[in-house]
Design a protein with these regions (language model features):
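Short, hydrophobic secondary-structure boundary micro-motifs
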Residues: 144-146, 181-182
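Flexible, acidic loop-helix segments that line cofactor/substrate-binding pockets
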Residues: 31-33, 145-163
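Extended, amphipathic, non-transmembrane alpha-helical segments
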Residues: 137-143
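Flexible, substrate/cofactor-facing loop regions flanked by secondary structure
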Residues: 116-119, 156
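Terminal low-complexity tails and localization/encapsulation signals of metabolic enzymes
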Residues: 1-105, 112, 119, 123-135, ...
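Secondary-structure edge/capping motif, primarily at the C-terminal ends of alpha-helices
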Residues: 114-117, 150
């Protein structure tokens, strides 16, 4: 190394880089790796991010129509108007809450296709769950807007709820791999070999 390099102004060196991440500190979306991904964060203290969030509500003329989907088909349940709780004159859209008939129908289909799902390749099941998480992230602005306007949540609470939903997907898909991939070897007091196998048990209604 030359003397001129040693005596160079440290600020001059630093300013040559756009950013200098510490390789020993994982980035926010990598803090749970290699086990799983982390949900995307939002720095609402940052002016650019804050203004972007505020601008979401400058265009709120969308009209949503939401119903349950059972076996790929929208239900025919009765629609009800949904209003902004902060402005009861503002119609946000219509929602068809699942009737007892729709609930029973969904359980029937879940039971019917359970054997097929049970024998579905584990990695393919994990891909489906992670794909759902990715769709939540891809549609974050629309979902955050709905949380605020339809449920009356703050932007911060809406972000937390969305990130929690995404993290649930990533967490349980990683747990599925951990629990279902290999048997859990249980130690026996007399030296025998005991293997605990995790299996899909049944469909459930949430």
């Amino acid at each position: 190394m030359l003397i001129k390099d040693i005596i160079k102004d440290p600020l001059e060196i630093i300013n040559q880089y756009k950013e200098i991440p510490n390789p020993q500190i994982p980035l926010p979306n990598e803090i749970y790796l290699p086990q799983r991904q982390n949900a995307k964060g939002y720095d609402i203290e940052n002016e650019t991010t804050r203004l972007k969030m505020i601008n979401l509500f400058n265009n709120i003329d969308e009209n949503y129509k939401v119903s349950s989907i059972i076996n790929g088909i929208e239900t025919k349940d009765q629609f009800k108007n949904v209003y902004n709780p902060a402005n009861l004159d503002q119609l946000l859209g219509q929602v068809a809450f699942a009737s007892d008939t729709s609930i029973n129908q969904s359980l029937d289909f879940a039971s019917k296709f359970f054997p097929q799902w049970k024998n579905f390749e584990l990695n393919e099941r994990v891909k489906i769950i992670n794909k759902f998480a990715q769709l939540l992230e891809d549609n974050d602005e629309k979902l955050l807007k709905i949380c605020v306007l339809e449920a009356g949540k703050t932007i911060k609470d809406s972000i937390d709820d969305l990130r929690e939903a995404i993290d649930f997907c990533y967490y349980y898909s990683s747990e599925a791999i951990r629990l279902f991939s290999e048997p859990n070897n249980l130690k026996g007091p007399t030296g025998e070999k005991n293997n605990l196998f995790m299996k899909v048990k049944a469909s459930f209604f949430l």
